[in-house]
Curated annotation (Swiss-Prot):
It is an enzyme of class 7 (translocase). This is NAD(P)H-quinone oxidoreductase subunit L. Keywords: Membrane, NAD, NADP, Plastoquinone, Quinone, Thylakoid, Translocase, Transmembrane, Transmembrane helix, Transport. GO terms for molecular function: oxidoreductase activity, acting on NAD(P)H, quinone or similar compound as acceptor; quinone binding. NDH-1 can be composed of about 15 different subunits; different subcomplexes with different compositions have been identified which probably have different functions. PANTHER family: NAD(P)H-QUINONE OXIDOREDUCTASE SUBUNIT L, CHLOROPLASTIC. The lineage of its organism: Bacteria, Bacillati, Cyanobacteriota, Cyanophyceae, Synechococcales. The gene is ndhL. It comes from Synechococcus elongatus (strain ATCC 33912 / PCC 7942 / FACHB-805).
Amino acid sequence: MTVTLIIAALYLALAGAYLLVVPAALYLYLQKRWYVASSWERAFMYFLVFFFFPGLLLLAPLLNFRPRSRQIPA
């Protein structure tokens, strides 16, 4: 393997992690913690959404997380 091929594979792995892997994990994290997060955690969530926005845009047409349905006591 040449050094150029190793560098290209490293760039491809980092791009895949930035655009697919981390945003998918972020979607799951946001789905679990959105309604119970503290203010500091909510600010951290906003930062993560800002930082990984391109990957979230790529995954948005494929994922559709609707809000939880409310339980209204009768």
